Amino acid sequence: MKRQRIGERMGACWMVVLFVLLALVPAARAESPRLDIYGFAMLDMGYQFKQNDPSWFDVLRPTKLPAFEDQFGQDGRFFSGVRQSRLGVKGYFPTDLGEVKTTFEFELFGVGVDAGQTTFRLRHAYGELGKFGAGQTWSPFMDIDVFPNSIEYWGPNGMVFFRNVQFRYMPIQGDTRMTIAIERPGASGDLGEFRSGLEAEGVQTRFPAPDLSAEYRRAFGMGYVEVAGILRYIKWDDNVDNQFDLEGDEMGWGVNVSSNINIDTAAEANDTIRLQAVYGEGIENYMNDAPADIGVVETGDPVTPVDGEALPVLGLVAFYDHYWSNKWSTSAGYSMVDIEPSEGMSDDAFARGHYALANLLYYPVKNVMMGGEFQWGRRENHDDGWTADDYRIQFSAKYNFSHTLGGM
């Protein structure tokens, strides 16, 4: 409750700052600054036929499904919340060097120590001038355009999905683009601690260098193709003075290929096929839903009995967004993540997750959306034969708002 009160106070402070900024915006004139205020209020209600970690009651994450029978109690739960609701401000300010672009964006979905809470959470705090950008925003290693038109919050588990602190250089901008960035190492999308699988007492993970990421997107008439990559260095130190030497290091790497293919329809919006395939080692914290980056390997050496190994991971995403008309749409698809566990990992360690959904959404008027969605997820353990399924039906209603102050 204390953390929730702190989060609410922080949110109130940001609201005060927002209104002060709005009061300072000058009347509309040529070349004047501009603020775009936007967001939405969103209600989620649904029924979960199985069970999962109660801290993640309103999302479908295969890693949070039970690792053994009735780990989280009995099956069947009703859930509801407004945690997807969002508030953001984008600023545009002319300077002698070009236009400064900034984004501050928050939502109410608590993660990390606030997992399960309705509390303010920072999504973006990012600024850009010319070909350089800095702050917290989408990692160049990910492609946000792969995310389907769905109402389940967490999204496809096999997708690379991470808003990270970074400094980026963008030599090519526009529909065809190129980005190179150095990123904060060791963080994760759900703000949990970095997990190396070497949590023995006295063994501490260290990141001597930032992660290096890059993307190149080539646009064409029907969409685009994007290739992204990442390199990272992970080290762990043995801080206990004994007969064992548990120090080590590993290089992590990954390649992510993604695409959107647009299909003309009679509706105002085009249908879209969204595809992604990623493979790498030691990059699990960049995935939308995956466990440890480093696994334990038993060596048989009396001095170094265990070592670390960057775990290979494969992620796939395939979704189709279809517009029946200007007022009705459907999204359906499948995603999976496959981890190759190390020999020293427990039999009930997470090895593979599946995710699928189908929905029918209705847009009665501009800025209003409502609809229902069926969701399915599955967890498969490493070596004990255990699988756990989850089935959900969710209804959501979303009300957008936006307003521009200043500008021409």
Residue ranges and their predicted role:
Residues K2-M15:
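Bacterial N-terminal signal peptides that target proteins for export
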Residues C13-A23:
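Bacterial N-terminal signal peptides
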Residues V25-A30:
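Sec/Tat signal peptide C-region and signal peptidase I cleavage site
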Residues E31-F57, T63-K64, F68-G189, R206-Y224, ...:
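Outer membrane beta-barrel
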Residues Q48, P94, F109-V113, S139-W154, ...:
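Sequence/structural signature of outer-membrane beta-barrel proteins
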Residues M222-F350, G407-M408:
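Detector for outer-membrane/organellar transmembrane beta-barrel domains
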Residues A388-M408:
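Outer-membrane beta-barrel "beta-signal"
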